UniProtKB/Swiss-Prot annotation:
Produces ATP from ADP in the presence of a proton gradient across the membrane. The gamma chain is believed to be important in regulating ATPase activity and the flow of protons through the CF(0) complex. Disulfide bonds: none annotated. InterPro entries: ATP_synth_F1_ATPase_gsu, ATP_synth_F1_gsu, ATP_synth_F1_gsu_CS. The gene is atpG. Coiled coil: none annotated. This is ATP synthase gamma chain. It comes from Pseudomonas putida (strain ATCC 47054 / DSM 6125 / CFBP 8728 / NCIMB 11950 / KT2440).
Protein backbone atom coordinates (compact mmCIF):
# COMPACT_ATOMS: atom_id res chain seq x y z
CA UNK A 1 0.00 0.00 0.00
CA UNK A 2 3.02 2.32 -0.34
CA UNK A 3 1.54 3.72 -3.58
CA UNK A 4 -1.83 4.30 -1.95
CA UNK A 5 -0.23 6.09 0.99
CA UNK A 6 1.64 8.40 -1.38
CA UNK A 7 -1.57 9.18 -3.27
CA UNK A 8 -3.41 9.84 0.00
CA UNK A 9 -0.64 12.26 1.01
CA UNK A 10 -0.96 14.10 -2.32
CA UNK A 11 -4.73 14.40 -1.89
CA UNK A 12 -4.28 15.90 1.58
CA UNK A 13 -1.70 18.38 0.23
CA UNK A 14 -3.94 19.47 -2.65
CA UNK A 15 -6.93 19.89 -0.32
CA UNK A 16 -4.82 22.17 1.86
CA UNK A 17 -3.82 24.25 -1.18
CA UNK A 18 -7.46 24.33 -2.32
CA UNK A 19 -8.51 25.87 0.99
CA UNK A 20 -5.89 28.60 0.55
CA UNK A 21 -6.90 29.44 -3.04
CA UNK A 22 -10.58 29.44 -2.05
CA UNK A 23 -9.86 31.89 0.78
CA UNK A 24 -7.79 34.09 -1.56
CA UNK A 25 -10.67 34.11 -4.04
CA UNK A 26 -13.07 35.38 -1.36
CA UNK A 27 -10.59 38.06 -0.27
CA UNK A 28 -10.12 39.16 -3.90
CA UNK A 29 -13.91 39.46 -4.33
CA UNK A 30 -14.12 41.77 -1.32
CA UNK A 31 -11.16 43.88 -2.43
CA UNK A 32 -12.47 44.08 -5.99
CA UNK A 33 -15.80 45.50 -4.82
CA UNK A 34 -14.02 48.17 -2.78
CA UNK A 35 -11.74 48.97 -5.73
CA UNK A 36 -14.78 49.26 -8.01
CA UNK A 37 -16.34 51.74 -5.60
CA UNK A 38 -13.17 53.87 -5.60
CA UNK A 39 -13.03 53.63 -9.39
CA UNK A 40 -16.67 54.72 -9.73
CA UNK A 41 -16.09 57.61 -7.32
CA UNK A 42 -13.08 59.00 -9.20
CA UNK A 43 -14.25 58.32 -12.76
CA UNK A 44 -16.72 61.27 -13.13
CA UNK A 45 -13.99 63.82 -12.30
CA UNK A 46 -11.46 62.13 -14.59
CA UNK A 47 -13.94 61.96 -17.48
CA UNK A 48 -15.13 65.53 -16.98
CA UNK A 49 -11.66 67.02 -16.92
CA UNK A 50 -10.78 64.89 -19.98
CA UNK A 51 -13.81 66.39 -21.75
CA UNK A 52 -12.77 69.94 -20.88
CA UNK A 53 -9.23 69.24 -22.04
CA UNK A 54 -10.66 67.78 -25.26
CA UNK A 55 -12.54 71.04 -25.82
CA UNK A 56 -9.34 73.01 -25.28
CA UNK A 57 -7.45 70.84 -27.75
CA UNK A 58 -10.08 71.69 -30.38
CA UNK A 59 -10.22 75.36 -29.44
CA UNK A 60 -8.01 78.30 -30.36
CA UNK A 61 -7.15 79.73 -26.96
CA UNK A 62 -5.31 82.99 -26.55
CA UNK A 63 -2.50 81.16 -24.76
CA UNK A 64 -1.06 77.90 -26.08
CA UNK A 65 0.19 75.80 -23.20
CA UNK A 66 3.27 73.63 -23.98
CA UNK A 67 1.09 70.54 -23.42
CA UNK A 68 -1.05 71.67 -26.37
CA UNK A 69 1.81 72.04 -28.85
CA UNK A 70 2.93 69.06 -30.91
CA UNK A 71 6.58 68.73 -31.86
CA UNK A 72 8.74 66.11 -33.59
CA UNK A 73 9.11 63.10 -31.32
CA UNK A 74 12.74 62.22 -30.61
CA UNK A 75 12.16 60.79 -27.14
CA UNK A 76 8.93 59.38 -25.69
CA UNK A 77 7.95 58.85 -22.07
CA UNK A 78 5.71 56.16 -20.59
CA UNK A 79 4.06 56.02 -17.18
CA UNK A 80 3.61 52.27 -16.64
CA UNK A 81 1.00 51.15 -14.08
CA UNK A 82 1.53 47.58 -12.88
CA UNK A 83 0.63 45.63 -9.74
CA UNK A 84 2.73 45.10 -6.62
CA UNK A 85 1.75 41.44 -6.23
CA UNK A 86 1.37 38.43 -8.48
CA UNK A 87 -1.15 35.57 -8.57
CA UNK A 88 -3.36 37.61 -10.91
CA UNK A 89 -3.15 35.53 -14.07
CA UNK A 90 -1.72 37.18 -17.18
CA UNK A 91 -2.66 40.73 -16.13
CA UNK A 92 0.88 42.12 -15.96
CA UNK A 93 2.20 39.92 -18.78
CA UNK A 94 -0.44 41.19 -21.21
CA UNK A 95 0.25 44.78 -20.13
CA UNK A 96 3.99 44.41 -20.74
CA UNK A 97 3.35 42.82 -24.15
CA UNK A 98 1.24 45.83 -25.21
CA UNK A 99 3.91 48.21 -23.89
CA UNK A 100 6.83 46.42 -25.57
CA UNK A 101 4.92 46.41 -28.87
CA UNK A 102 4.37 50.19 -28.66
CA UNK A 103 7.98 50.79 -27.58
CA UNK A 104 9.27 48.68 -30.48
CA UNK A 105 7.21 50.70 -32.95
CA UNK A 106 8.75 53.90 -31.55
CA UNK A 107 12.29 52.53 -31.60
CA UNK A 108 11.90 51.51 -35.25
CA UNK A 109 11.39 55.23 -35.94
CA UNK A 110 14.49 56.16 -33.95
CA UNK A 111 12.59 57.33 -30.86
CA UNK A 112 14.31 56.86 -27.48
CA UNK A 113 12.30 55.78 -24.42
CA UNK A 114 12.09 57.02 -20.80
CA UNK A 115 10.00 55.17 -18.22
CA UNK A 116 8.18 55.99 -15.01
CA UNK A 117 7.18 52.71 -13.36
CA UNK A 118 4.37 52.31 -10.83
CA UNK A 119 4.23 48.91 -9.09
CA UNK A 120 6.81 46.30 -8.07
CA UNK A 121 6.05 43.98 -11.00
CA UNK A 122 6.90 46.71 -13.50
CA UNK A 123 10.16 47.49 -11.71
CA UNK A 124 11.13 43.80 -11.74
CA UNK A 125 10.24 43.46 -15.42
CA UNK A 126 12.41 46.37 -16.52
CA UNK A 127 15.34 45.23 -14.39
CA UNK A 128 15.30 42.04 -16.50
CA UNK A 129 14.09 43.44 -19.83
CA UNK A 130 16.13 46.64 -19.64
CA UNK A 131 14.94 50.21 -19.99
CA UNK A 132 15.74 53.75 -18.92
CA UNK A 133 13.65 54.03 -15.74
CA UNK A 134 13.80 57.66 -14.55
CA UNK A 135 11.18 57.40 -11.79
CA UNK A 136 9.58 54.56 -9.85
CA UNK A 137 7.10 54.09 -7.02
CA UNK A 138 5.57 50.97 -5.50
CA UNK A 139 3.56 49.67 -2.54
CA UNK A 140 0.75 52.21 -2.89
CA UNK A 141 -1.56 49.88 -0.98
CA UNK A 142 -5.20 49.02 -1.50
CA UNK A 143 -6.28 52.68 -1.32
CA UNK A 144 -3.79 54.71 -3.38
CA UNK A 145 -3.71 58.47 -2.90
CA UNK A 146 -3.09 60.98 -5.66
CA UNK A 147 -0.56 62.65 -3.35
CA UNK A 148 1.61 59.52 -3.58
CA UNK A 149 1.75 59.86 -7.37
CA UNK A 150 2.46 63.58 -7.71
CA UNK A 151 6.25 63.24 -7.32
CA UNK A 152 6.67 60.59 -10.03
CA UNK A 153 4.26 62.34 -12.39
CA UNK A 154 6.11 65.64 -11.88
CA UNK A 155 9.38 64.01 -12.98
CA UNK A 156 7.81 63.14 -16.34
CA UNK A 157 6.00 66.47 -16.76
CA UNK A 158 9.20 68.41 -16.01
CA UNK A 159 10.99 66.26 -18.58
CA UNK A 160 8.34 67.20 -21.15
CA UNK A 161 8.45 70.92 -20.30
CA UNK A 162 12.27 70.90 -20.46
CA UNK A 163 12.20 69.21 -23.87
CA UNK A 164 13.82 65.98 -22.66
CA UNK A 165 10.78 64.00 -23.88
CA UNK A 166 8.38 64.98 -26.64
CA UNK A 167 5.41 62.75 -25.86
CA UNK A 168 4.02 61.21 -22.67
CA UNK A 169 1.67 58.22 -22.47
CA UNK A 170 0.15 56.19 -19.65
CA UNK A 171 0.07 52.38 -19.89
CA UNK A 172 -2.40 50.50 -17.69
CA UNK A 173 -5.14 47.86 -17.56
CA UNK A 174 -8.67 49.13 -18.13
CA UNK A 175 -11.37 47.48 -16.05
CA UNK A 176 -14.02 46.50 -18.60
CA UNK A 177 -15.88 44.04 -16.38
CA UNK A 178 -15.11 41.29 -13.89
CA UNK A 179 -14.04 38.88 -16.64
CA UNK A 180 -12.25 41.36 -18.93
CA UNK A 181 -9.27 43.61 -18.32
CA UNK A 182 -7.81 45.40 -21.35
CA UNK A 183 -4.20 46.70 -21.53
CA UNK A 184 -4.17 50.19 -23.05
CA UNK A 185 -1.63 52.82 -24.10
CA UNK A 186 -3.09 56.34 -23.95
CA UNK A 187 -1.32 59.55 -24.92
CA UNK A 188 -1.46 62.22 -22.22
CA UNK A 189 0.59 65.04 -23.74
CA UNK A 190 0.62 66.69 -26.15
CA UNK A 191 -3.16 66.79 -25.95
CA UNK A 192 -5.10 64.78 -28.48
CA UNK A 193 -8.25 66.42 -29.85
CA UNK A 194 -11.35 64.47 -28.81
CA UNK A 195 -13.15 63.00 -31.86
CA UNK A 196 -16.60 63.12 -30.22
CA UNK A 197 -19.54 64.35 -32.25
CA UNK A 198 -20.09 67.16 -29.76
CA UNK A 199 -16.62 68.54 -30.48
CA UNK A 200 -16.92 68.94 -34.24
CA UNK A 201 -16.99 72.71 -33.78
CA UNK A 202 -14.49 74.94 -31.99
CA UNK A 203 -15.07 75.97 -28.41
CA UNK A 204 -14.20 79.44 -27.17
CA UNK A 205 -13.50 80.15 -23.51
CA UNK A 206 -13.18 83.22 -21.37
CA UNK A 207 -10.36 82.75 -18.87
CA UNK A 208 -10.34 84.32 -15.40
CA UNK A 209 -8.00 85.66 -14.12
CA UNK A 210 -6.00 84.84 -17.28
CA UNK A 211 -5.47 81.92 -19.64
CA UNK A 212 -1.85 81.20 -18.65
CA UNK A 213 -2.50 80.92 -14.92
CA UNK A 214 -5.60 78.78 -15.40
CA UNK A 215 -4.14 76.44 -18.02
CA UNK A 216 -0.84 75.97 -16.16
CA UNK A 217 -2.78 74.57 -13.21
CA UNK A 218 -5.45 72.75 -15.20
CA UNK A 219 -3.03 70.84 -17.42
CA UNK A 220 -1.08 69.46 -14.47
CA UNK A 221 -4.31 68.47 -12.68
CA UNK A 222 -5.47 66.78 -15.87
CA UNK A 223 -2.38 64.55 -16.14
CA UNK A 224 -2.43 63.76 -12.41
CA UNK A 225 -6.12 62.80 -12.55
CA UNK A 226 -5.62 60.52 -15.56
CA UNK A 227 -2.68 58.73 -13.92
CA UNK A 228 -4.60 58.37 -10.65
CA UNK A 229 -7.62 56.97 -12.51
CA UNK A 230 -5.31 54.53 -14.30
CA UNK A 231 -3.91 53.36 -10.95
CA UNK A 232 -7.40 52.92 -9.45
CA UNK A 233 -8.70 51.03 -12.49
CA UNK A 234 -5.58 48.87 -12.62
CA UNK A 235 -6.15 48.00 -8.95
CA UNK A 236 -9.72 46.91 -9.70
CA UNK A 237 -8.49 44.93 -12.72
CA UNK A 238 -5.82 43.28 -10.54
CA UNK A 239 -8.35 42.10 -7.96
CA UNK A 240 -10.72 40.84 -10.67
CA UNK A 241 -7.90 38.93 -12.38
CA UNK A 242 -6.77 37.49 -9.04
CA UNK A 243 -10.33 36.41 -8.23
CA UNK A 244 -10.61 34.58 -11.57
CA UNK A 245 -7.14 33.03 -11.19
CA UNK A 246 -7.89 31.77 -7.68
CA UNK A 247 -11.30 30.43 -8.75
CA UNK A 248 -9.65 28.52 -11.60
CA UNK A 249 -6.99 27.21 -9.21
CA UNK A 250 -9.67 26.07 -6.75
CA UNK A 251 -11.67 24.35 -9.50
CA UNK A 252 -8.56 22.68 -10.93
CA UNK A 253 -7.61 21.45 -7.46
CA UNK A 254 -11.08 19.91 -7.13
CA UNK A 255 -10.69 18.12 -10.47
CA UNK A 256 -7.24 16.87 -9.50
CA UNK A 257 -8.53 15.58 -6.16
CA UNK A 258 -11.26 13.62 -7.96
CA UNK A 259 -8.70 12.07 -10.33
CA UNK A 260 -6.35 11.14 -7.49
CA UNK A 261 -9.25 9.76 -5.43
CA UNK A 262 -10.17 7.49 -8.35
CA UNK A 263 -6.54 6.34 -8.70
CA UNK A 264 -6.37 5.76 -4.94
CA UNK A 265 -9.57 3.68 -4.97
CA UNK A 266 -8.26 1.58 -7.86
CA UNK A 267 -4.92 1.03 -6.10
CA UNK A 268 -6.70 0.10 -2.87
CA UNK A 269 -9.04 -2.25 -4.73
CA UNK A 270 -6.08 -3.91 -6.48
CA UNK A 271 -4.26 -4.35 -3.16
CA UNK A 272 -7.36 -5.89 -1.51
CA UNK A 273 -7.88 -8.20 -4.49
CA UNK A 274 -4.26 -9.31 -4.29
CA UNK A 275 -4.55 -10.00 -0.55
CA UNK A 276 -7.71 -12.07 -1.08
CA UNK A 277 -6.01 -14.02 -3.86
CA UNK A 278 -3.05 -14.75 -1.59
CA UNK A 279 -5.34 -15.92 1.24
CA UNK A 280 -7.36 -18.14 -1.10
CA UNK A 281 -4.16 -19.51 -2.63
CA UNK A 282 -2.73 -20.28 0.83
CA UNK A 283 -5.93 -22.02 1.94
CA UNK A 284 -5.97 -24.13 -1.22
CA UNK A 285 -2.37 -25.21 -0.61
CA UNK A 286 -3.30 -26.41 2.89
Amino acid sequence: MAGAKEIRSKIASIKSTQKITSAMEKVAVSKMRKAQMRMAASRPYAERIRQVIGHLANANPEYRHPFMIERPVKRAGYIVVSSDRGLCGGLNTNLFKALVKDMSANREQGVEIDLCVIGSKGATFFRIFGGNVVAAISHLGEEPSINDLIGSVKVMLDAYLDGRIDRLSVVSNKFINTMTQKPTVEQLVPLVATPDQDLKHHWDYLYEPDAKELLDGLMVRYVESQVYQAVVENNAAEQAARMIAMKNATDNAGDLIKELQLIYNKARQAAITQEISEIVGGAAAV
